[in-house]
Amino acid sequence: MSLPHIDLLYSLSGLFVGILVGLTGVGGGSLMTPILVLLFGVHPATAVGTDLLYAAATKATGTLVHGLKGSIDWRITGRLAAGSVPAAALTLWWLHTHGMNTPGTARMIQLVLGIALLLTSLALIFRPQLTAFAARNPLVPSPARTLWSTVLTGAVLGVLVSMTSVGAGAIGVTVLLLLYPALATTRIVGSDIAHAVPLTLVAGMGHWLLGSVDWSMLLSLLLGSLPGIVLGSLLSARAPERLLRNLLAATLVAVGVRLVLA
C-alpha cells in the first residue's frame, strides 16, 4: 500500500489556520473550507467532507483539554448531540439522494457555506453585546423549554455543519450564551467543543461513505494545523484578541459575500 502524498501547500494552509484557531478560538471550518474552495479549487463537497474529519481530530484534542479542566457540561453536550446527530444523518441522506457531486449540489453547498460564514461573522461581531445583554436580562425559561431549545439548536447546527462544516463554533457558542446566561463562558465553550466531536465525526464519516473525503489532503492539513494550534494558543496571551476577531469577522463577511454571489 502506497503512502499518502503530502502536499506542502495544504500543510502551510493548515499551519496558518491552526495559528488563527489558537489565537482566536474560532473554528477551523469557517477558515479552512473557504480556503480549499476558493484558493485551491477543491469541489465544495470534498472540501466540506475532508474539513469535517479535520475538525473532528482538532476538536477531540480540545475536548481532552477541557475535560481535564472540568469545563464541560455533559448535559448540554448531550442535548445538542440529540438534535445534531440525527439532523446530520438526514442532511447526508438528502445530499446523497440529490447527488453529492452534481453542479447543483456544489452550488447549493457553496451558497449555504457563504450564508453560514456571514452568520459566523455576525456572531463574532455581536457576541460581546449579546453576552452583556444576556447578563443584564437573563432569560428564565422553563427547564423543558431550555431542553428543547438546546436540542433544536443542535438540529440546526447539524444541518449547517453537515452541509458546510461551519457553525458548531461561533454560532453554537453564541446561542448557548443566550440559553444558559448563568453558566460560565469556559463551560459553554467546553461543552460546545465536546459536542462538535460526535457531530463532525458522524458527518465526516458520512461524507467519506459518499466518497467526498480526500485522505491525503486531510493528512497534509493536520500536519500543519496541529502544531499551528499549539503555537497560536501559546501566542494568544500576547495577541490583540479583539482586533484579530474583528479582522477575522471582516474577512468572513467578504468571503461569505463572494461565495453567495459566485
Sequence positions of predicted segments:
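Juxtamembrane transmembrane-helix termini in multi-pass membrane transport proteins
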Residues: 24-77
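Transmembrane alpha-helix boundary and packing residues in multipass membrane permease domains
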Residues: 34, 51, 92-93, 174, ...
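Juxtamembrane transmembrane-helix boundary motif
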Residues: 1-13, 38, 65-163, 206-209, ...
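Conserved glycine-rich helix-kink/hinge and helix-boundary motifs of the Major Facilitator Superfamily
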Residues: 49, 189-190, 249
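Transmembrane helix boundary and interhelical junction motifs in multipass membrane proteins
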Residues: 25-32, 165-173
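Alpha-helical transmembrane segments of multipass membrane proteins
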Residues: 18-19, 35, 39, 63-64, ...
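Interfacial segments of multi-pass membrane proteins
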Residues: 32-45, 171-187
